[in-house]
């Protein structure tokens, strides 16, 4: 769920996901359209695509389980759908960590009006 996603961002990227990524670029936050503004926004685009492939549960509200093993987040549990949600979140949080240097404050609360180009397919 979105609360867990925020926690994973904190664990993996060391950033406050709720504040930093809630409304960033064209894809971080609710919805998404246009072209990703930078590598950070592309993390959100890929995350949106990943959520779009999840079937049988709701990525925004269903909870999942994970643990940390040797410093890495490992998704667990018996429910394959919830495990898929966890993997989407884990990959996105890792992407945020790996692309911290591309985060540009000018894209914070960027607004959909700036994202009018045709969206690329997942």
Swiss-Prot record:
Catalytic activity from the UniProt record: a 1,2-diacyl-sn-glycero-3-phosphocholine + H2O = a 1-acyl-sn-glycero-3-phosphocholine + a fatty acid + H(+)
Pfam families recorded: Phospholip_A2_1
GO molecular function list: calcium ion binding; calcium-dependent phospholipase A2 activity; phospholipid binding; toxin activity
Assigned keywords, A-Z: Calcium, Disulfide bond, Hemostasis impairing toxin, Hydrolase, Hypotensive agent, Lipid degradation, Lipid metabolism, Metal-binding, Platelet aggregation inhibiting toxin, Secreted, Toxin
Tissues of expression: Expressed by the venom gland.
Domain of life: Eukaryota
Biological process according to GO: arachidonate secretion; lipid catabolic process; negative regulation of T cell proliferation; phospholipid metabolic process; regulation of blood pressure
Top EC class, one word: hydrolase
Keyword Hydrolase on entry: yes
SUPFAM superfamilies listed in its UniProt record: Phospholipase A2, PLA2 (SSF48619)
Cofactor annotation: Ca(2+)
Co-factor remark: Binds 1 Ca(2+) ion.
EC number: 3.1.1.4
InterPro entries (alphabetical): PLipase_A2, PLipase_A2_Asp_AS, PLipase_A2_dom, PLipase_A2_dom_sf, PLipase_A2_His_AS
Binding-site residues, Ca(2+): 27, 29, 31, 48
GO cellular component: extracellular region
Other comment: Negative results: does not show myotoxic activity.
PANTHER family assigned to the protein according to its UniProt record, in alphabetical order: PHOSPHOLIPASE A2 FAMILY MEMBER, PHOSPHOLIPASE A2, MEMBRANE ASSOCIATED
Family: Belongs to the phospholipase A2 family. Group II subfamily. D49 sub-subfamily.
Name this protein carries in UniProt: Acidic phospholipase A2 BpirPLA2-I
Source species of the chain: Bothrops pirajai (Piraja's lancehead)
